[in-house]
Amino acid sequence: MRTAIAIPVGFCAALAAAALLRADAPVQPDEATRIYGAIRAFELTGGSLPVSDFTLTRDRIEMTFTGTFHFAGTVENRVTGAVFIGRGTMRAAVPPSEFERDHVRRLIGADTVESDFTTAVLRWTDDTIDLFPARAGEGGAPAADAARVAAGFEARLTRETGVNLASRLALSIVNRESPGLFFVQFEGGRRARFNVLVDHQHRIPVSHFNVNGGEKGLVFAYRPIIFRTETWMAFYSADDYARGTATYSDVHNLVDVTHYDVDVDLTRPDERLSLTARMTMNVSAPDVRAIPFILGEGLSTYQDQRLQHQLHVRGVRVDGAPAAWTQEDWESGLTIWLPQAVGPERPLTVEVDLDGRFLQVNDLVRGAYYPISNTAWLPRHGYLDRATFDLEFRHRKRDSVASVGTRVREEPDPSAADLMITTYQMTDPVALVVFALGPFERHRQEVTFESGGDPIPLEFHKLPDRQARIAAVKEDFVLAELDNSLRYFAAIFGRYPYKSFGAAFHPYPFGQGFPTMLMLAPADQAAGGTFAFISHETAHQWWGNIVAWRSYRDQWLSEGFAQYSSVLYTGLRDKPQTAAELLRDMRQSLLGPPRTLTGAGRGRLNDVGPIILGHRLNSSQSFGAYQALVYNKGALVLRMLHYLLSDPAADPIVSGDGGFNRMMAAFVEEFRDDAASTDDFRAVANRHFASSPVAVRTGTNQLNWFFRQWVYQTGLPSYRMEYQVADQAEGAVLVTGTVFQDNVPADWMMPVPVVFTFDGDRTGRSVVHVRGASSTFEMRLPMRPRNVQLDPDGWILSERTATTRK
């Protein structure tokens, strides 16, 4: 796996050395939960400090205070927080990123994050306490208003964000992190209540904000109207910017979970889901005393969903012995406190008993049950860590279970006549697994791959027509599409590695492509949209499962690739015109305005940000940007690479796509069962492009310029060609002209196809390498063309493309 990339002025993250450890004395085994309890209580018994124009700087956050600090009592001989009452100002400079600058403007209407405030809650495990002047000694009662602020702080923060900050602080102490973290919540100013976090080990950004591209800092606020927090700004540390490199978040993972053995009790699905997850893991950091896990992340505050439906911990065992754990109401995770410190390569077995109302019932389907979140029902450490799985489900005899992997057991429960036990096994390492429960009908056939090898079973888990209040699903059609699309992608992208494939019906308006099993909405009409939908989810076997995305910034490698894969399949399965219509709709989606809470926003979705920003493109002022950019623009960017890897003298589709298919198959093989970054893909693309016909014709042997323009920037050019035809000797002609490239930076360049149509429905193809505002060309042809067009098939993404004969 690639370990380092540079930070261009603002978009990519890179990997460097992990943080140094402090040389503090180790915490004794019985101290961890006491430390947590003291931090969570947040009692202001640490004395007070009046200040006037006192300035405190933490990374890019500058704060000025006039008033009084009331400090928490010491924990492990250190102060971990304070409440400020008075008047103050703060300023957080926007990092050197065009997206962050535009994002801040879009969300708060300013060029920098600035505000006044009257109260502030500060929590830390770094050296913040050393920056204060001497304070009054411990003891004594704090001011009543400060005590009220402290008393309500932790519970409210956990409710709004899912973050248990006290647990994060305690973990930082017992694991001896250095540097530690810093958090401050401001309130009482013109921006109301908002928060700033600097977490050098990335734990809160990864677990609770899905920000894992190396960013250590966040500025965010809870938005009641959307029932979740909204990130105003994310940033690397000041040292990262100075070095030009930063650590990917997964460098700081404490453990690597290699196997899950899960017992799932589905015997009372109307009431609750109960399970025991036994995790086999290897420790990957020194002196680990506490391990955080995410669970139920993504559940919102709407109708108290996270409070009412979260899976609650009922017990924890480490290597067979009971162990301490913490999980608060509203928390989207848990922390396990080990009985003693463990170091690298130490194997651990951790068992967690969980129970909660985590199954959802849909009125459209009677007797079928699905997790409230298909991706958050098992505890996980880090982001998309891979493991193997043994999943045993105990359920009513009238139900059956669909899940990932191979079904290796389905038989009556010897301890209860009315129950069944069904076991699935996933022997390939994967990141996410899912299940569905209901009176499914299983429809089966086999998939035989053209490349040879043993056939694999294919199953579609369909609800009986009488169970659903929606139109019946034609199982033969779904099975045929699953079979066709799987074989097609295996032929062009490389070997399908799993021992089975299938899908389960779910009554929701989206699909999800888990390893070996798709969750499919009702779709069985022989139409382009259906072909594209099923094949998109099938393509996730390669783009997302076989090859995962390294960080949220790289998710276009999954969704954009699956989207374009579905276009290729649909053009073959139906007709080229259907694929052209899908591409047209994708291009059109970029030109529409973003949606806001009050209606249509300003500008175009294309301009919200580059595709490298992943889910952060969506906000309360830019709904729809993630779908338009990561899915659709990501697909169109891959389509342009398809053209660049082809022979410009031939139709890339008709000619067999050799260069493109070889590149994609090589990418799969190099990162099989691994995660890839955009830079990883760029390296593969560079190798394959260097000797391509387009590279030879244009004198360009690498694609760094292409990724800079289309992945890291937001440009959307318009092209227009003006040409004329002059007769030459012996019936030949000379075509000369100019291709104009508008609305993009002056250094923008792009090879653009030109197509000539001759009598007899014959065609000729060439390419113009456009650099800057315009480029001229001349081409000699053996006969006069009936028509000349600039990129009539839309290989190059543009707002508009036009051709004029002079």
Model-predicted regions and their roles:
Residues 285, 618-620, 625-737:
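Amphipathic alpha-helical substructures
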Residues 8-19:
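Bacterial N-terminal signal peptides
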Residues 1-5:
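Positively charged n-region of N-terminal signal peptides that target proteins for export
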Residues 369, 384, 393, 518-595, ...:
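Zinc-dependent metallopeptidase catalytic helix centered on the HExxH motif
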Residues 24-484, 488-496, 626-628, 671-674, ...:
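Acidic/His-enriched low-complexity segments
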Residues 492, 497, 505-519, 524, ...:
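Catalytic zinc-binding patch centered on the HExxH motif and its immediate surroundings
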Residues 559, 563-640, 644, 671-672:
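Acidic/His/Gly-enriched intrinsically disordered linker/tail segments
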Residues 372-377, 468-470, 547-548, 615-625, ...:
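Flexible glycine/proline-enriched surface loops and loop-helix/loop-strand junctions
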